[in-house]
Amino acid sequence: MREGELDFNFSTAKNAEKLDEEGRKLPQGMKFVDFVLEEEEQSIMLEIKDTSCKARGGDSKAVLAKQRECDEFPKKLMNDEWVAHELTPKARDSYTFLHLMKRDTKPIIYVLLIGSENLSPLDPALLVAFKDRLFARLCQETEQPWVRQYVIDCLVLTEKTWPLAFPQYALTRIS
C-alpha cells in the first residue's frame, strides 16, 4: 500500500485499509487518517506526514514551497495548533467511523509517521514532547477527559524509527 512516495508492506496484518482513499465517499465534514491496520490484539490508526516527498510539478515555485514546508516543519512540532486542528480531529473522526461500523472492538494505537528524509535531524526530545502533547489531546479535548478512551497509546515515528516499532511492516521510499 502506498501513500505518496512511501510504500508499505502490510501483508502480515490481519487487515489493512487506506481509509482516506482518493475518490472514496466520506461522511460530510469528516477527515480520516491514512491507514487503519487490524492486528490480532490491536488496531493501528496511521497518519503520514511526508515532508520529504518531491515537490508536485517540479517547477521552481513548487520546489521553493516544499523547501519552506521543510524549514517550517520543526515549528509545527513545537506548538499545539497542528495537534488541535488537524491530527486530533482526524483521529477522532476515524475512530467515530470505526465505531459506527462496529470495527472498534480492539484497543487502538494512533501512529504518526513523519517522512523526515529531507529534514535536518529531528531532536528525539522534541518528538517525545510532541508525542506526549498529542496523546494528552487525544485523551482530553474539553474540560474533562473522554470517558471512553478511544486511543490507548500514541507513537510519533520517523522513517528511521519505523522499523524499530513495526519490523513486520516494511517501509520503502519510492522516488
Where are the regions that the model predicts?
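Low-complexity intrinsically disordered segments
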Residues: M1-A13, V151-S175
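Acidic-basic catalytic patches of nuclease active cores, encompassing PD-(D/E)XK
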Residues: M1-F32, E38-E40
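Conserved catalytic cores of phosphodiester-cleaving nucleases, focusing on short active-site segments
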Residues: F35-L37, I44-D50
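Structural motif
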Residues: Q42-I44, I109
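Surface-exposed, flexible loop/turn segments at secondary-structure boundaries
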Residues: S43, C53, N118
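Catalytic cores of nucleic-acid endonucleases
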Residues: T51-I114
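Short, low-complexity, polybasic intrinsically disordered segments
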Residues: I108-L164
